[in-house]
Amino acid sequence: MSHVTLLGLPDDLGNQLSRVLLEESHQASRKLYVSDLRRGPNTCAVFISGDSPDYRQTLSLLREARPGLPVIVVSRQPDAKRWLDALDAGAADYCGAPFEREQLRWIMGSLSSSAKLAAAAPAGAIALAAAARSHG
């Protein structure tokens, strides 16, 4: 079971998202502020509201506070323009209500795959450098 944080989401969105995440075996906690991420369990991803006018600022604060932590932007209505804007602002992904199990399974799975690739990259680079030195 992984742990995710729902940061500043309105109650209706937070409740819907928590329910579906739990169905997919993810534990969700609710936080109000970026600084609250320092307290409580370690989180593997943060969901924030794209409906908030300052969500880009929240993304920026999260990147400063927790570099590399995936942030998923959520909204009440799926919208292609918002999706592209969220990705452009640095979000790992975007989803809109109503939340579906398959949708969240895919998002959480892609985050897990990305984390595995990132963790393997330094080891692979070290191995390639060592191989190059031994043949050089």
Stretch-by-stretch model annotation:
Residues 7-32:
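Two-component/phosphorelay signaling modules centered on CheY-like receiver
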Residues 115-136:
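CheY-like receiver
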